Amino acid sequence: MKSHEYIVICGLNRSKVGRYIAIVASFLSFISIFLALTALEWLKNYHINSHIPASVFSLISAGGIYMGLYAWFDKNLWQNSYLGKFLCVPNLEGRWHVDGHTRSEGGNTWEGELKIVQTWDKVRIHLKTKASHSDSVTASIIYDKGIGYQLLYNYRNQPKTGEEHLTSHVGFAEFRFDADLKSAEGHYFNGQGRATYGTMTITRIEHA
């Protein structure tokens, strides 16, 4: 399963982020081209004939700079803690230890590891236990100023070979994170193959 887009509810509008990056790209493009042309004029004073290839101007065009800035923002820049607070998007990327409690079928406890791979545009949530593994299909993050961040996602679960008592199924999970983003509590519901439900507590092991 590959990473997929996710929705941010009550965070900074994503289209505004694109516009802000476009404004910065336009400004940097203007400065870059101005400096390049100034350098050419300066070289002429020393009777040095030079020219800048069209390919260079294409790289320092607003479009070229925008692509570079957006790639940097998507992979790394958005994870800055101060910028993250402004964007209202938490950095959940990393490995999390899972303590689960099935509340149906007689009830039982289980453990697993949740791995979240996250960029500004996409996310992948993978849960691995001794009996099965699941991957997110859709996801959304909700920001509530009075409560904090919530993560909601749908997933598809696949039992490991030899687990005959388990069947493939889809489900839904929801987590509410502490203010320090080091732990969260939540619950899950399964259906279309396995009608079970329960609770989960996750604790961050490490950042990616």
Curated annotation (Swiss-Prot):
GO function terms (MF aspect): nucleotide binding
Keyword Nuclease: no
Mutagenesis or variant effect for Y188F: Beta barrel no longer binds c-di-UMP
Transmembrane segment boundaries: 20-40, 52-72
Pfam families tied to this protein: Cap15_CD_rec (PF18153)
Keyword hit for Magnesium: no
Record localization: Cell inner membrane
Keywords tagged on the record: Antiviral defense, Cell inner membrane, Cell membrane, Membrane, Nucleotide-binding, Transmembrane, Transmembrane helix
Membrane topology (UniProt): Multi-pass membrane protein
GO CC entries: plasma membrane
GO biological process: defense response to virus
Major place of residence: membrane
Family: Belongs to the CBASS Cap15 membrane effector family.
Function: Effector protein of a CBASS antivirus system. CBASS (cyclic oligonucleotide-based antiphage signaling system) provides immunity against bacteriophages. The CD-NTase protein (CdnE) synthesizes cyclic nucleotides in response to infection; these serve as specific second messenger signals. The signals activate a diverse range of effectors, leading to bacterial cell death and thus abortive phage infection.
Subunit description: The beta barrel domain oligomerizes; in the presence of c-di-UMP or c-di-UAMP higher-level oligomers are detected.
Domain notes: Cell toxicity relies on the transmembrane domain; its replacement by a SUMO domain prevents cell death in cells also expressing DncV from V.cholerae. The C-terminus (residues 78-208) forms a minimal, eight-stranded beta barrel. Trp-96 stacks against Arg-204 and forms a hydrogen bond with Leu-92 to close the barrel. A set of conserved residues in the 'top' of the barrel (Thr-129; Tyr-153; Tyr-155; Asn-157; Tyr-188 and Met-200) surround a probable cyclic dinucleotide-binding site; when mutated these residues decrease or abolish nucleotide binding and impact protection against phage in vivo.
Protein name: CD-NTase-associated protein 15
Organism of this sequence: Yersinia aleksiciae
Lineage: Bacteria, Pseudomonadati, Pseudomonadota, Gammaproteobacteria, Enterobacterales
Gene behind this protein: cap15
